[in-house]
């Protein structure tokens, strides 16, 4: 179910403060965050945000096509290594 339109999109307060501080100083630096549930809003465009995937922080450059999506969509948490190899020689 989607979020109600009468509510604003969720953005973590500490992440919003960091974005606003960088926008006022007009600086570009990597912002580290654990908030995967935060929605990307237009003031984030052009920044690089390092999103935690459970093991490390992955730096993601925010573009205008990402607006409206969640940060966690761009940092995959699972690493699929493929199905088990069917080795018939070891069964003999």
UniProtKB/Swiss-Prot annotation:
<keyword id="KW-0934">Plastid</keyword>
<keyword id="KW-0699">rRNA-binding</keyword>
<dbReference type="GO" id="GO:0009507">
    <property type="term" value="C:chloroplast"/>
</dbReference>
<dbReference type="GO" id="GO:0015935">
    <property type="term" value="C:small ribosomal subunit"/>
</dbReference>
<comment type="similarity">
    <text>Belongs to the universal ribosomal protein uS19 family.</text>
</comment>
<keyword id="KW-0694">RNA-binding</keyword>
<dbReference type="GO" id="GO:0003735">
    <property type="term" value="F:structural constituent of ribosome"/>
</dbReference>
<dbReference type="Pfam" id="PF00203">
    <property type="entry name" value="Ribosomal_S19"/>
</dbReference>
<keyword id="KW-0689">Ribosomal protein</keyword>
<comment type="function">
    <text>Protein S19 forms a complex with S13 that binds strongly to the 16S ribosomal RNA.</text>
</comment>
<protein>
    <recommendedName>
        <fullName>Small ribosomal subunit protein uS19c</fullName>
    </recommendedName>
</protein>
<dbReference type="InterPro" id="IPR002222">
    <property type="entry name" value="Ribosomal_uS19"/>
</dbReference>
<dbReference type="InterPro" id="IPR023575">
    <property type="entry name" value="Ribosomal_uS19_SF"/>
</dbReference>
<dbReference type="GO" id="GO:0006412">
    <property type="term" value="P:translation"/>
</dbReference>
<keyword id="KW-0687">Ribonucleoprotein</keyword>
<dbReference type="InterPro" id="IPR020934">
    <property type="entry name" value="Ribosomal_uS19_CS"/>
</dbReference>
<keyword id="KW-0150">Chloroplast</keyword>
<dbReference type="GO" id="GO:0019843">
    <property type="term" value="F:rRNA binding"/>
</dbReference>
<dbReference type="InterPro" id="IPR005732">
    <property type="entry name" value="Ribosomal_uS19_bac-type"/>
</dbReference>
């Amino acid at each position: 179910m989607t979020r109600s339109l009468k509510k604003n999109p969720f953005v973590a307060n500490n992440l919003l403060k960091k974005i606003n501080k960088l926008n006022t100083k007009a600086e570009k630096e990597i912002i580290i965050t654990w908030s995967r549930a935060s929605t990307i809003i237009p003031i984030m465009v052009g920044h690089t945000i390092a999103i935690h995937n459970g093991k490390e922080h992955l730096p993601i450059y925010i573009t205008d096509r990402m607006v409206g999506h969640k940060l966690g969509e761009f940092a995959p948490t699972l690493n699929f290594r493929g199905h088990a190899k069917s080795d018939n020689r070891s069964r003999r």
